[in-house]
């Protein structure tokens, strides 16, 4: 059975891993984010998971099933935040997955498929202006060139940041997850107001907006917008 007190304690602990400011400030690969990542690793180990990390820093904890040759059932989310973020966005998906594992251990529940609890790194765009980078790395959709191109407001490249955390940016294309995956499930906060408005406790997502980001260069002259004809 799910133990509410364990989850409450975990959320409270994670809320302490933040830089100063309002809300949660746990931008990807900062000291606060790295400390939160270690907390997640520790909780996975406590739950009996076999923990692995990849060259991008993604964390995967395995609970081996009765038939380890079957495709894995993957659950999880991320724990980095946007500036002035909340304590549940992403975090609820990781901590709830760990709590499910703890509850299965308590109940002696056996399962056929191996379960993989995943905490993706750098899923928010708050630091490098691009999102879902950890999951892109696991899909083989991130290149060394991308790591050099993506920079934070201080001009530090993602490549340099990964090096600073003793990760392996030059091997980023080897991070691609090779094991067959049966399914991926993520518990997430509602980022809109539909469930709240309809007084529903939970919803199943069947579609989601997919943002696109473009780099645009506009060339021209600065002139008065009301008095300058376009042909001049």
Task: Locate predicted features.
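Midchain, well-structured core segments that form catalytic/ion-binding scaffolds
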Residues: 122-123, 129-232
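N-terminal capping segment at the start of a domain
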Residues: 1-30
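Active-site cofactor/substrate anionic-group-binding motifs, chiefly glycine-
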Residues: 51-87
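Thiamine diphosphate
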Residues: 28-48, 71
């Amino acid at each position: 059975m799910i133990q509410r007190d364990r989850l409450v304690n975990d959320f409270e602990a994670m809320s302490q891993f933040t830089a100063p400011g309002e809300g949660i400030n746990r931008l990807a690969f900062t000291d606060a984010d790295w400390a939160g990542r270690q907390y997640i690793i520790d909780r996975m180990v406590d739950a009996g998971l076999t923990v692995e990390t990849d060259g991008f820093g993604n964390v995967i904890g395995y609970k081996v099933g009765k038939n380890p040759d079957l495709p894995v059932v993957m659950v999880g989310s991320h724990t980095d935040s946007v500036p002035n973020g909340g304590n549940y966005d992403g975090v609820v998906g990781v901590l709830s997955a760990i709590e499910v594992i703890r509850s299965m251990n308590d109940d002696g529940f056996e399962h056929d498929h191996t379960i993989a609890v995943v905490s993706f790194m750098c899923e928010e765009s708050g630091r490098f202006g691009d999102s879902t980078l950890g999951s892109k790395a696991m899909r083989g959709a991130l290149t060394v060139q991308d790591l050099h191109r993506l920079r934070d407001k201080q001009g530090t490249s993602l490549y340099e940041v990964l090096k600073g955390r003793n990760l392996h940016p030059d091997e980023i294309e080897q991070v691609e997850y090779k094991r067959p995956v049966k399914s991926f499930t993520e518990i997430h906060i509602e980022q809109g107001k539909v469930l709240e408005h309809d007084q529903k406790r939970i919803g199943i997502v069947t579609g989601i907006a997919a943002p696109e980001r473009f780099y645009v260069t506009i060339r021209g002259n600065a002139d008065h917008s009301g008095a300058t004809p376009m042909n001049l």
